[in-house]
Curated annotation (Swiss-Prot):
Name of the protein: Carboxypeptidase DacB
SUPFAM superfamilies per the UniProt record, alphabetical: beta-lactamase/transpeptidase-like
Consequence of gene loss (knockout): Essential, it cannot be deleted.
Region of interest called Disordered, as start-end residue ranges on this chain: 39-64
Residues spanning the signal sequence: 1-28
Organism: Mycolicibacterium smegmatis (strain ATCC 700084 / mc(2)155) (Mycobacterium smegmatis)
Entry's EC annotation: 3.4.16.-
Keyword DNA damage part of the UniProt annotation: no
Uppermost EC category: hydrolase
GO-annotated biological processes: cell wall organization; peptidoglycan metabolic process; proteolysis
InterPro entries: Beta-lactam/transpept-like, Peptidase_S13, Rv3627c-like_N
A GO molecular function held by the record: serine-type carboxypeptidase activity
């Protein structure tokens, strides 16, 4: 079959149709383009960039300073609370260092754990923030099979298995020491513990032995597990009465040696070959944990680091002397300080509000930049550490929450606070408050006293 032949009229009709289609497409395109152009011209201009008030702003150094009279008037009602017992204190301007209020600031008082402010300050003045403590295992050169766990002052070492939590963040592990020993191919038959880094008594004057079972302290030895806790992740865990021996037993068990055969070497071992070592977390991290939890064992061990750096014995007396020496070296008045430990646990300690406030003021001021981290290490009212559950029960307390930071101190009849607060006018103040012979609501009373500083403009 031949293909169908188009007639001339058919070609003309198709041509006209194509032309009409092209015209329609062009017209539609023009119409669309015109409408799009009109729409573009109708778009409103872009709005100005959004702005927001920053959540954190520098303090206003031009904010009015409270007057002595204004502060005294504002504090009067809170000071009248009989549950404060004997109350001493000092308040100063953080920027100028000017004293704004004081009451018995030079009277020696029982400080409790607020004493840790001094220990922390001395550590910051003396040691590198990244300083670590090393625990080693040494093989005896003349006694095959004998290894010695040599304590270097790390009280945070843990026997917890790998991958499990420990009380202390970044703690070194007994399991790592055991792995290193095995990697050396040494057949271990005996384990001993060298505790010679520390000297003197293991318990300070004024410590109650019952506080070991109460979970507040352990005998101070140069190596221990989880700060001497018998239950490593339990807040109220009782402490061991033989922490160094426990550490040695843990290493022995990890190496397949009978734990009950472990003995101490109080005078240390001469010579030997180091076959394993682990290191603690950096100093700044240990200070943070110590201040947040008010950890007595950590405070004592860190003070002994200061003593070692100054060439003093790592003992209670050596540590206290080293801490006070470093504070005096930067102009802190320690004349009223009579201390027998570095944690504040002893009932025999005496300290003045003047000394405490001078330390905090030096940290908040401009003259001692090495002390500045102390401000960040203070617990936050209503937010962290030993102040996490305080300042939340009253309007005045809630108003101070987040604005006030302080180290706490608590013993029977004693409550203390030393820290920093921004008042209602934006002025930064430092303070130290110590209450002895306090009544049953003494802690609440001292919190209320410090909270006044936040609500106070006190410029008149």
């Amino acid at each position: 079959m031949r293909p169908t032949r188009w007639r001339r009229s058919t070609h003309v009709a198709v041509g006209v149709a194509v032309l009409a289609l092209v015209v329609a497409v062009v017209a539609a395109a023009a119409l669309f383009t015109g409408k799009h152009s009109d729409a573009a011209e109708a778009v409103p201009p872009a709005p100005p960039p959004a702005t927001a008030d920053p959540g954190v702003v520098p303090v206003d150094l031009s904010a009015p300073t409270p007057t002595r009279r204004g502060l005294a008037t504002a504090l009067a009602a809170a000071l009248a609370n009989p549950d404060l017992g004997l109350i001493t204190g000092r308040i100063t301007d953080a920027d100028t260092g000017a004293e704004l209020w004081e009451q018995g600031a030079r009277v020696p008082m029982q400080p409790a754990s607020v004493n840790k402010v001094l220990t922390t300050a001395a550590a910051l003045l003396t040691l590198d923030r990244d300083a670590r403590l090393t625990t080693t295992v040494v093989a005896a050169d003349d006694q095959p099979g004998l290894v010695v766990l040599r304590g270097g002052g790390d009280t945070t070492l843990s026997a917890a298995p790998k991958g499990t939590d420990t009380w202390y963040k970044g703690a070194a592990r007994i399991s790592d020491l055991a792995d290193q020993v095995r990697a050396r191919g040494i057949r271990v038959t005996r384990v001993r513990v060298d505790t010679s880094a520390y000297s003197g008594p293991t318990m300070a004057p004024g410590w109650d032995p019952a506080d070991i079972d109460g979970g507040d302290i352990a005998p101070m030895e140069s190596v221990m597990l989880d700060g001497g806790r018998t239950q490593p992740t339990t807040v109220e865990s009782r402490r061991s009465k033989s922490p160094a021996l426990d550490a040695g037993k843990a290493l022995a068990a990890a190496l397949g040696v009978e734990p009950e055969s472990v003995t101490l070497m109080p005078s240390g071992m001469r010579g030997g070959t180091t076959i394993a070592e682990v290191q603690s977390a950096p100093l700044i991290e240990r200070l943070r944990q110590m201040m947040n939890e008010s950890d007595n064992v950590m405070a004592e061990s860190i003070a002994r680091e200061v003593a070692e750096a100054l060439g003093r014995p790592q003992s209670f007396e050596g540590a206290v002397g080293a801490v006070l020496t470093q504070l005096r070296s930067v102009g802190i008045d320690t004349s009223g300080a009579k201390l027998v430990d570095s944690s504040g646990l002893s009932v025999d300690n005496r300290l003045t509000a003047l000394t405490l406030d001078e330390v905090v003021n030096a940290a908040a001021g401009h003259t001692q930049p090495a002390l500045r981290p102390l401000v960040d290490l203070l617990p936050i009212a209503g937010g962290s550490g030993t102040l996490s559950n305080r300042y939340l029960d009253t309007d005045a307390g809630r108003a101070a929450a987040g604005w006030l930071r302080a180290k706490t101190g608590s013993l029977t009849g004693t409550n203390a606070l030393a820290g920093i607060v921004t008042d209602r006018s934006g002025r930064v103040l430092t303070f130290a408050l110590i209450s002895n012979n306090a009544g049953p609501t003494g802690r609440t009373a001292i919190d209320a006293l410090a909270a006044v500083l936040r609500s106070c403009g006190c410029g008149a």
